[in-house]
Amino acid sequence: MSNEADLLHGPLEDRHRDLGASFAEFGGWLMPVSYAGTVSEHNATRNAVGLFDVSHLGKALVRGTGAARFVNSALTNDLNRIGPGKAQYTLCCNESGGVIDDLIAYYVDDDEIFLVPNAANTAAVVEALQGAAPAGVTVRNLHRSYAVLAVQGPRSANVLAELGLPSDMDYMAYADTSFRQVPVRVCRTGYTGEHGYELLPPWESAGVVFDALAAAVSQAGGQPAGLGARDTLRTEMGYPLHGHELSPDISPLQARCGWAIGWKKEAFFGRDALLAEKEAGPRRLLRGLRMVGRGVLRAGLTVLVGDTPVGVTTSGTFSPTLQAGIALALINTDADVRDGQEVTVDVRGRAATCEVVRPPFVAVKTR
């Protein structure tokens, strides 16, 4: 682990320490990984509500005449599918079709798009966009201008309503409001598969919002949750994590994110390579694996059919919901592996039998 002094620190670190958090490095940031324990936090989010500080996530602003048109010519998804007050999952690709990052784009208006990339990739996304931006369009890195607080779970709407924050909105919509004189962007987004929200207050005012949310979450039977639970929750949903299921060497098609590509658009980064891959078919595809017996799967393990290696796990964990080991894996398409088929995974020399499944592993409840 990196020395704490070398890591970036969020605006709420003292509060997390007061709550008894344990910390770990993620994307160059020192972040709370757990409080009461990952399983407890996971189950609280699935059954009640969890409060996550994900302020390490990046923030960037594209502004100027035709900003939306420019972003639409750079990122994969089609911004014309949405409009002001809506958000969209999209990808920033390289010219070979690999993924620089996956991110959320918030459509403010035709001349302003707000972006939330991953922590470690913010500078790369900003650099890619700055290099392509036309005259009159600026791309600014606002990484430490805003915090991001996620309220996730079946009681999340009750928590926001209790505080007078907007909660009755469609999935992937957002609203700008204020809370105790602090401006807040409230978004119907998340990374858990549950009904939830992500709130963006100014970095320096995040404590006001966090304290109120923490009290309301506790009153609703929930608890603060760290990045450990965030990872088990997203893995159960089959959501990709950059550096695992997506990377400069892993395309959106291989990760089953082709739905986030506007194929009819005339331009976006990596378009020619991705069209060629779509025509030929990806050489590997993301699949889910569920252990038949006991054990835990991790990333980087070899997947075999018989004695033949056919892929590698990209993420793995113990699913608190299923009480079973699960994993995501990139499997070679020429191996003709089918859902329901049994394969083995080499876990430190032990052959672990797994069933191939199509994620999500548990029901989606985002809407």
UniProtKB/Swiss-Prot annotation:
> What are the BP-aspect GO terms?
glycine decarboxylation via glycine cleavage system
Q: Does the keyword Transcription apply?
A: no
Q: Which UniProt keywords apply?
A: Aminotransferase, Transferase
A Pfam family of the record is GCV_T
Q: Where are the transmembrane segments?
A: none
Q: What is its EC number?
A: 2.1.2.10
Supply the enzyme class, top level: transferase
Q: Write out the GO cellular component annotations.
A: cytosol; glycine cleavage complex
**What one GO molecular function would you report for this record?**
transaminase activity
Q: What InterPro entries would the database entry show?
A: GCS_T, GCS_T_bac, GCST_C, GCV_T_N, GcvT/YgfZ/DmdA, GcvT/YgfZ_C, TrmE/GcvT_dom1
Family statement drawn from the similarity comment of this UniProt entry: Belongs to the GcvT family.
Q: What PANTHER family does the annotation carry?
A: AMINOMETHYLTRANSFERASE, AMINOMETHYLTRANSFERASE, MITOCHONDRIAL
Supply the name of the protein. Answer: Aminomethyltransferase
Source organism per UniProt: Mycolicibacterium paratuberculosis (strain ATCC BAA-968 / K-10) (Mycobacterium paratuberculosis)
